Amino acid sequence: MLNLCHALRGVRQFSCSVIVKVKCASCSIKLQDQDPSKPGYYTKPKSLPDSKLNPDLQDLKYLLFSQDIQLSKQAIQNDPDLKTKRDLLLRVICKRCSNALHHNNYNPEEFPESTLNDILNYVPRGSNVMHIVPFVEFPLHLDPNVLKRNDLDTTLVLTKSDQVFKDKNAVSKKVPIFMKQFLKNTLRIDSNKTFAISALKNWNISMFYNYFKNYTYLLGNPNVGKSTLINTLLQKYLGYKVKIDSTGKINSPSEEVMQEAFTNPKNFFKIQAAGVSHIPNLTRSGQAYQVGGKILFDLPGYSTSTSRLRLEEPIDERWLQRLRKTDLFNRKHIKQKTYESMKGTSQGGCYTVGGIFYLVPPKGSINQIVKYIPGPSKTFKNIEKGIDVFNSCNSSSGTHPLSRYCGIKSVICEKSQYKRYAIPPFIGSIEIVLKDIGYILLRTTGRYEFKGLHEIWIPRGIQVGIREPLENLIESGYQRYIETNGKESSCPRDRPIISSLYEMAPDEADTLNAVKKSYLEKTEKDLSARRFVDDDPYDLVQHLEKKKNPYWYYQW
């Protein structure tokens, strides 16, 4: 987004006149050196560089003197030239990003959340918008408020599809048909503008590029894959940052900078790339990119819930990095679907991954669990035992024999810090989705017999939902759609396929009746969604083969 010629022209004295032309290479905010309490601040060194150096280069190195960047050290050893000045300038990052990215000093208060209205201030009315949603956590992150806006031309883009499907065939052909009918049936949105992609696997990227229009904005929650998608496009179509002034004029990099795309493509891409990090809310300002013949805007992520828990508070930093780094996802789980078995017990036996959640099957049920969340799993006699063990792990500074299973901090090592949720009745398999964490597949085995509701205990503030297994749902729906020449919908109409869960009091014994009561309350203003309201709950759950997914209701 910098006009490099202007940025490097006439730099003689170190001052804010230099900095105001430079944005942080990580979060895109304007740099300043006057007020440490304000965004964009960077730290001056205590001592000056060698005064014999070219004065222009000295000023630029002065910006990076206190930052732990290997490239600046290497440049100081070499004879300075214009290229070195440009490289140093383009790699300047603010103190906030430097601390978080290079020194593991992360203060959540310095990464404030934005609302949808905050981000829409960057987007002119009538603009082309790509609503970015990670398919792996569908339907979480999907925002009907974006899709229903009449003042935007919106396309739904489902990222991280490689974490759901074995190959891109379903992603290319089957997902768009399914989503068109899902949006129409569930949200009354009539749209055929849906793309499922994988930026890491390069699935459908060419199709996506051919589709999106000039001057398109990427809109979505933090860490949904916007910057990763942009970087894939930059590499594939030789893209770069540009600056657009108030008159709409596009200021592109100089001819010298563009020449480096051919002489040193790795360095060129490193300079032009969008800032990708596992840290949420890292991007703080819009950034324009020239991708082929089109302009694409990367926007900061926005949050939809004011009560959302920052995962940095309860979850161990190393575990959190594994959860958030998409490239660490092990796709063998998609292909092999290796499961763990667990039987429900009278003591409340539970299954957990790191203490991030506790799944409690009903007594006597036999369950298979396929885990798509990084980290080792563990079963305990009950939730209290699990919390007690993880509390000991935190107290022992890593010396406890079960420390490798602990992914939470001491702040969450109390049962009162968790919410108890009842999962509405189901038969066969479901997927439990935890926002910004991942999902697990839960399957009950043997001949169906209602033994009680499954429960899951989750730290307060983490959003959770369930869905029918997504890959099977789309594959079987597509087959039905093709066999009937499109007469039957690929998305089921006879039942809901997604649902929120129902919060229960810790001492609630009759969870089934409590679920029905909550269901009636949630659907009070959506009567058309109600099903089986006249049935006795305990009679209803005896016939789930015919009356599927009772009390399923997703609250958008």
From Swiss-Prot:
Residues 113-305 form the CP-type G domain. GO terms for cellular component: mitochondrion. Transmembrane segments: none annotated. Its main location: mitochondrion. Keywords: Mitochondrion, Transit peptide. Residues 1-21 form a transit peptide. InterPro entries: G_CP_dom, GTP-bd, Mito_lipid_metab_GTPase, P-loop_NTPase. It is found in: Mitochondrion. The keyword Membrane does not apply. Gene3D superfamilies: P-loop containing nucleotide triphosphate hydrolases. It holds the Pfam family MMR_HSR1. The keyword Signal does not apply. One of its GO terms (molecular function) is GTP binding. Interacts genetically with prohibitins and thus may be involved in the mitochondrial lipid metabolism. PANTHER family: GENETIC INTERACTOR OF PROHIBITINS 3, MITOCHONDRIAL (PTHR46434:SF1). Belongs to the TRAFAC class YlqF/YawG GTPase family. GEP3 subfamily. This is Genetic interactor of prohibitins 3, mitochondrial. It comes from Saccharomyces cerevisiae (strain AWRI1631) (Baker's yeast).
